[in-house]
Amino acid sequence: MTRDDREMCLPAGEELTELLPDSLPPLAVDIDGTLTGPDRGLDPRVMPVCRSWPSTLVVATGKSMPYPVALCEFLGRETLVIAENGGVVISGPTESIQFEGSPEKAQAVVEAYRAEGYTTGWPETDLINRWRETELAVSRESPLPPLERIADEHGLTVVDTGYAYHVKSPDVSKGQGLRTLAGELELDPEAFAAVGDSQNDVSTFEVAKRAIAVGNADDAARAAADRVTAETYGAGFLDAVHLLRESVD
């Protein structure tokens, strides 16, 4: 099917929900750049699809946990969340919250970064980090090389999600979070499909059976994906759903 063909037959929103077969796999989906538009607002067309997904739906994001938890709530879905790039794993059905990471080391990195004259780039209210439990995020407007150097000195790593630089433990990832959450749910993590757009989705792609990058994805996500959608952002997610439908029809 060509891009033009797919654009002509790609249903959106409520129309697409009527075409979702029960045989669709469990899904792990990113938020920023995947369910949103370029303005970072949620694309309203993705909401009914996520709400009606016939299998398990996991929200896997670099955001702190209040954001994906709220998204699950407003979608009317069970709270199944991988937050902070795998640092926080929440399973509502089994009443489990697990934390992995080194928040003290992340704080030490930021303090050393500031001591060298740099800032995190956020306003004093810092709603980006206020609720973080396992990592810290620095604005992409701040210099990256010194941040990477200081993080390495503390045994941490920096992941560029395209929206922020995340200072985190190297052994924490969305992919490992998916394995943990799938275990809680007694599901095979390799049965999942995954949709994302960024370097921090690569580990999820490596675990999932089907990995789809939206058209605005960075090079790392594109290289790790099985498919890359013709469309970008939220429209790319709908395109990914179309591809998943084709794979089970």
Residues covered by each model-derived region:
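Short, acidic/turn-prone active-site loops that include or flank metal/cofactor-
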Residues: 84-88, 216-219, 233-237
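Conserved acidic, metal-coordinating active-site core of Asp-based
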Residues: 119-208, 212, 216, 220-222
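Short acidic-hydrophobic, aromatic-tinged amphipathic segments that line or gate anion-handling sites
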Residues: 227-232
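Active-site phosphate-binding/coordination module
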Residues: 38-128
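Asp-based phosphoryl-transfer active-site loop
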Residues: 19-40, 205
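Short, structured coil segments at secondary-structure junctions
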Residues: 53, 75-77, 85, 152-154, ...
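Non-catalytic pre-domain segments flanking phosphatase-related domains
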Residues: 1-29
